[in-house]
């Protein structure tokens, strides 16, 4: 769902830090 996309983006950002 939409939340899954948000989590995926959030995970990518966290991985970038």
Curated annotation (Swiss-Prot):
The keyword Secreted applies. Its main location: secreted. Keywords: Amidation, Amphibian defense peptide, Antibiotic, Antimicrobial, Secreted. Expressed by the skin dorsal glands. The modification Isoleucine amide is found at residue 17. This is Aurein-3.2. GO terms for biological process: defense response to bacterium. Belongs to the frog skin active peptide (FSAP) family. Aurein subfamily. Has antimicrobial activity against L.lactis, L.innocua, M.luteus, S.aureus, S.epidermidis and S.uberis. Probably acts by disturbing membrane functions with its amphipathic structure. Shows anticancer activity. The keyword RNA-binding does not apply. GO terms for cellular component: extracellular region. Transmembrane segments: none annotated. InterPro entries: Aurein_antimicrobial_peptide. It is found in: Secreted. It comes from the Eukaryota.
